[in-house]
């Protein structure tokens, strides 16, 4: 048990110093200590096990699938987890050089600022469909934040000669500063604005 105290992510970053400020996300963001963020899909066996998966691995997993934009998704980054682990590792080095902070803390801040608190759902009442504002569950907040961040990274890299590592570092730093120009923060604000209009 004494050995787990010295486990550093990528043998560089200490996760014990990382703090989740948002009380709603404390249970949904896992900062479990491990050297390599790779659990070989063990979390897929039970429904909410993904909440126990290290947040860095969840970012990597989310980055492996772009969504349903066919032209940009075909054959790109699908299943290339080792490649993405190295990408995240390099992006974290860039973040550490530029900010002087623990890059995992920057990632957690980026998730906190990109996670929407309100969303809309459809309710059919008397044959008429209404959009109603609802609160978002903590796990879904993290899911949406990771989706927004990974989509922003891939949108930035598409048809761009700059390497993905630099784009990833840039997008995470923008989101961590709650920059309104960050695509992930923009999407979160847009979602909350639509939800507020549907109250």
Predicted regions and their residues:
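Strongly charged
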Residues: 1-85, 89-199
């Amino acid at each position: 048990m004494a050995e787990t105290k010295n486990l550093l992510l990528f043998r560089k970053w200490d996760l014990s110093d990382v703090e989740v400020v948002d009380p709603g996300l404390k249970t949904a963001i896992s900062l479990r200590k491990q050297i390599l963020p790779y659990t070989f899909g063990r979390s897929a066996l039970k429904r909410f096990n993904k909440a126990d998966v290290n947040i860095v691995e969840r970012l990597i997993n989310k980055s492996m699938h772009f969504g349903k934009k066919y032209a940009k998704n075909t054959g790109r980054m699908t299943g290339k987890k080792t490649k993405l682990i190295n990408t995240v590792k390099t992006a974290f080095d860039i973040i550490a050089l530029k900010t002087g902070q623990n890059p995992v803390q920057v990632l957690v801040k980026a998730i906190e600022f990109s996670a929407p608190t309100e969303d809309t759902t459809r309710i059919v009442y008397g044959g008429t469909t209404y959009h109603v504002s609802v609160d978002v569950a903590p796990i879904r907040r993290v899911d949406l934040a990771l989706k927004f961040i990974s989509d922003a990274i891939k949108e930035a890299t598409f048809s761009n000669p700059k390497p993905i590592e630099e784009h990833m570092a840039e997008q995470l730093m923008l989101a961590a500063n709650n920059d309104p120009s960050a695509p992930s923060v923009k999407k979160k604000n847009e979602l909350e604005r639509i939800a507020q209009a549907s109250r």
